[in-house]
Structure formats: C-alpha cells, structure tokens
Amino acid sequence: MSDTKVYLLDGGSLVLDGYHVFWNRGPGGEVRFPVYSILIEHAEGRFLIDTGYDYDHVMKVLPFEKPIQEKHQTIPGALGLLGLEPRDIDVVVNSHFHFDHCGGNKYFPHAKKICHRSEVPQACNPQPFEHLGYSDLSFSAEAAEARGATAQLLEGTTRANSTFEGIDGDVDLARGVKLISTPGHSIGHYSLLVEFPRRKPILFTIDAAYTQKSLETLCQAAFHIDPVAGVNSMRKVKKLAEDHGAELMYSHDMDNFKTYRTGTQFYG
C-alpha cells in the first residue's frame, strides 16, 4: 500500500423528494440518489470513510426512501469484491451519523473510530427534527443506550468497542488525507480531501453538497441543523477545490455517480 488508492464502495440507492434535495427550490418529485463509502488504501493503513445504510433499518424506519441494495452493495459485500473483509480495515471515520453514513459501522468492532467530537452527543440527544436522520444507532452503544434503542446493537457491541476519538476543525488523517470541517448539514460534518502522487486531488463534498447543482447554486438539502453554516461550508469547499485544483465528487448525485469508478476500479 505504498501509493494512495481510493475505492468507492457502491452502497445502493435511496429516494427523496426534490424539495428535500434542493431546499425550498426543487423541483419536486422523486429523486433517486446513490449512497457510497470511501476506502483509502494508504501507506499508513486502510481508512474507511462512512459505511452506508442498513437495508433492514431503512425498510423498518424510513421505507418511504425506497432502498435498493443488492448483497454486493452491503459493506461486507463491497469489501468482498476487493478481496477484503471488515477485519482488514484499520480506521473507520464517519463524516457524521445520519443513517445513510453509519449503517455498516457495526461490522468494525476492532477498528479505530474517528468522528467530530460533537456528533456522538448529538446522536444521543438530537433536535426534534433530527430524529430520523440519527435513527440508526447501531454504531454506538452509548447512543443506543441514551435513546433506548439497544435492540439495534449487533451482538457483541459494547461501549468499549464502539467508542470514537473525537476531533475538531480541519485534521490531517494521514499524509495527503485531510478531513475538512464543514458543519451545517450536521453539527460536526466533515468533507474529505485526498491528494495523490500522480493525479489531481479529489475533494469529496460528502453531505456539505449533495450534488454538483447544490454546490453551484449554494442550495443545500432540507436536512440540516444550521443553514447559514451550511452555506458557509459550501463556500469553503468551493474555495478549497479552486486552491488545490481538486476534482469534486458529490455524495448523492446520480448523474455524476454514473461516471465514477466503483467496484475494483480505483483512483490513484
């Protein structure tokens, strides 16, 4: 793993109304969007950024999001396409803990876990309008206990093996891999900048901007905790991309996702 490689793990898709994707702008109607995780193979280890959604959880709690997910799009299945198992991942980083970004955390009791220091407390005690976003609590025994949802925990999940290192601000995760603080969508949201020896950097907006249109128009999703911070974060992402000459990749943009490399293909 001397050269940095980035794999996008296809996690299936979900549906939202257009007015939720593009807050107060639309147009309305069903918008099917991708969900994916980011695997970084690096000289310092294997880093997994986000873990997608759990199909059974969505069908139980948010069936109106109409999940489509095949076996190879689960976290174990997607890793299996690369000849890997969950135990091969060294570090799991969660950009935030909305259900479509943490559904596979339960497969990594052994891994070091990192998130913004405000995210676990927020999942324990979300705002009334955040309860569905923070509805899959299988990532944290602490959060599940706080919300009376311990039935969600995979057998063997404990506080000891589901504890996170809390960070704040922009943080170097590894050489050439940087977490970019972009609050607004959630209280402690992170975007991701990855640099490579032989190609331009990639800046993953994650949910700071669902789509290319979102970033170009500074139109955030309807799911947020601080819309002013969200707009400022989008401006920060745009400037970082310009300053670094980075390629932008979006979290929930189906048109762009169709052009991304997935499966065994990689960036590096």
Curated annotation (Swiss-Prot):
Optimum temperature is 60-70 degrees Celsius. Stable for 10 minutes at 50 degrees Celsius or lower, 64% of activity remains following 10 minutes incubation at 55 degrees Celsius and 14% of activity remains following 10 minutes incubation at 60 degrees Celsius. Pfam families: Lactamase_B. Its cofactor is Zn(2+). Optimum pH is 7.5. Retains 36% of maximum activity at pH 5.0 and 10% of maximum activity at pH 9.5. The keyword Chloroplast does not apply. Homodimer. Belongs to the metallo-beta-lactamase superfamily. This is 4-pyridoxolactonase.
